[in-house]
A protein has these predicted regions:
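Alpha-helical protein-protein interaction modules
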Residues: 1-139
Length: 139
């Protein structure tokens, strides 16, 4: 199940990933890593420009484990894309604090897990565009 959702997130079609993740949550609702499952649903929504749904799931992930810097980064991107710049900046600052160092958009591009050109383009148009609006530097 985990491998199937990864294929859908990383090479598409993204919308087909969500049912697999929801099934994982139903099978193991007390999973100690449940925040990651919530995050993955948010990620799928963000890449499809469903910002409200993405925020809902990223906030749920943050509630389950507030110590994950990447959750705060993705939440910052989603808030910025909605025009909620103060909330975006606060989430980006928390991601930086938790990680202990700043990241740049260039670093994120260089280490992306999105290998398929279509998914990489979606990431650029959503996640990275949102982080840029939230204040993450290019270099």
């Amino acid at each position: 199940m985990q491998d199937i959702y990864r294929c859908k997130i990383f090479i598409g079609p993204i919308e087909e990933a969500i049912p697999f993740i929801e099934q994982a949550i139903r099978v193991s609702p007390r999973d100690p890593l449940i925040a990651n499952w919530y995050f993955r649903i948010g990620e799928a929504h963000l890449l499809q420009s469903h910002n409200d749904e993405a925020i809902l799931w990223f906030e749920k992930a943050r509630g389950a484990n507030a110590g994950l810097p990447y959750v705060h980064r993705y939440l910052a991107a989603a808030y910025a894309l909605k025009g909620e710049t103060e909330r975006a900046a606060a989430e980006l600052a928390e991601a930086r604090r938790l990680r202990g160092e700043d990241l740049t958009l260039a670093q994120l591009r260089a280490t992306t897990r999105y290998e398929a050109p279509i998914i990489r383009a979606l990431s650029e148009a959503t996640y990275l565009a949102g982080l840029r609006k939230a204040g993450m530097p290019e270099e």
